[in-house]
């Protein structure tokens, strides 16, 4: 039986998957575990009442597990791992926080209007930390040869970074960070990612209001 999941719809396109990286993280988990699912696309700017009834805070993603709607991608991914342990996507605890500061640094740099505020260097520092981790472990993924939950969390964030910074700042991950670039390619080329990614123009549109704020 298919699992029900509510995710963000694309702005201005009622039948197209939106650009929420946290929704994609859960979709990637479902795909990698080969679990059947049914998506319900939610307009987060005009939430239907039935959705607010099941998710009073109005946040996506939410997934129905054992008859109850569950919010928060961290919680959902943890419960999916417990309920459907095979194939395992469990990340070894010592690797769970690898790359965890990249998304915040990306958002700060993307919104920055001051080239000298240090936000670009802060992002590069976080990417260099990921580079060093990937180089000192046996890759291609954070925990080694096998993809795990930490990779599925990072993949959508690195995609947003690549698309949004490329569009708004003509910026890309430095060529010197070969392990990070290869890591992103490995993630983006997976069938699970192709099946769940937002179109580039939708990612660009999703960040427009924040860039121009």
From Swiss-Prot:
Active-site residue list: 20
Reported phenotype of the disruption mutant: Mutant develops distinct foliar lesions under ozone exposure.
One Gene Ontology cellular component annotation held by this UniProt entry: mitochondrion
Binding site for glutathione: 8, 19, 47, 60, 73, 160, 207
GO function terms (MF aspect): glutathione binding; glutathione dehydrogenase (ascorbate) activity; glutathione transferase activity
Motif placement: Glutathione-binding: 20-25
Binding site for L-ascorbate: 8, 19, 210
GO biological process: acquisition of seed longevity; ascorbate glutathione cycle; L-ascorbic acid metabolic process; positive regulation of salicylic acid mediated signaling pathway; protein glutathionylation
Role: Displays a dual function. As a soluble protein, exhibits glutathione-dependent thiol transferase and dehydroascorbate (DHA) reductase activities. Exhibits glutathione-dependent thiol transferase and dehydroascorbate (DHA) reductase activities. Key component of the ascorbate recycling system. Involved in the redox homeostasis, especially in scavenging of ROS under oxidative stresses. Plays a role in ozone tolerance.
Name the record gives this protein: Glutathione S-transferase DHAR2
């Amino acid at each position: 039986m298919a699992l029900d999941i509510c995710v963000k719809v694309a702005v201005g396109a009622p039948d197209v998957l939106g650009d929420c990286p946290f929704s994609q993280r859960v979709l990637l988990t479902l795909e990698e575990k080969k679990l059947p699912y049914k998506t319900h696309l939610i307009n987060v700017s005009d939430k239907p009442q039935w959705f607010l009834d099941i998710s009073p805070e109005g946040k996506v993603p939410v997934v129905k597990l054992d008859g109850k709607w569950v919010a928060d991608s961290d919680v959902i991914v943890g419960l999916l791992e417990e309920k459907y342990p095979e194939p395992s996507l469990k990340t070894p605890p010592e690797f769970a926080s690898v790359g965890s500061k990249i998304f915040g640094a990306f958002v700060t740099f993307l919104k920055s209007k001051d080239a000298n505020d240090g936000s670009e260097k802060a992002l590069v520092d976080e990417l260099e930390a990921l580079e060093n981790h990937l180089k000192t472990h046996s890759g291609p993924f954070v925990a080694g040869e096998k993809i795990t939950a930490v990779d599925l969390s990072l993949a959508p964030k690195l995609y947003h970074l690549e698309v949004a910074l490329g569009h708004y700042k003509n910026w890309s991950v430095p060529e010197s960070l070969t392990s990070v670039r290869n890591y992103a390619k490995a993630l983006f080329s997976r069938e699970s990612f192709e099946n769940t990614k937002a179109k580039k123009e939708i990612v660009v549109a999703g960040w427009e209001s924040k860039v121009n704020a």
